[in-house]
Amino acid sequence: MTKYVYAFTEGDRDMKDLLGGKGANLAEMVKLGLPVPPGFTITTDACRAYLAAGESPETLDVEVTSHLRNVEQEMGKRLGDKNDPLLVSVRSGAKFSMPGMMETVLNIGLNDESVQGLAAQSGNERFAWDSYRRLIQMFGKTVQDIDGDRFADILHKLQADKGYKGDLDMTTADLKHLVEEFKKVVEEETGEAFPQDPRRQMDLAIEAVFRSWNTERAHIYRR
């Protein structure tokens, strides 16, 4: 059976064809004893299989679940936990560097409940709500193919109406308002509410990163 997922503790810098440059270098860093947060790499084989079939390989879900559980155990947190949520990022990594060409989604694991837990654990309510609005904005644009201007226009209007110079001027109340407005955009554009299931967020983000290999800008960069 093809192995599609490797923990950061597996592999080394010579496995760039399989793990991509980022994944191989993270594995090498762990091998050298450098401090690396727990995580895992989905192989380029999985990406190729997805692009060929239009869906993820049958066994990928099981492997991702197993590796996610290991990360949760190491971190002492659970993805989507309403009291102390684990947040993850889904990042791209071809075997050669393609800066800015493929997609990244941050703050996966936040939803209407876990944002409250992040606020309590961090002691910073503003940080938690800013992280959540950024997730919805990034997820909408990257994963759901919503025009980024839909979100940017709402953000800029709020700042203009209140005379703000930039993001740092926004209050917690402003950010909560943006979350609600951004969720409305997602529902208007997709016909569905922003996904509250953190695992669904992660799975959809993984597929979006796979698809980003074939975007026009990625094709142009590889020429």
Language-model region placement:
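N-terminal beta-alpha lobe that positions the nucleotide/phosphoryl donor
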Residues: 1-223
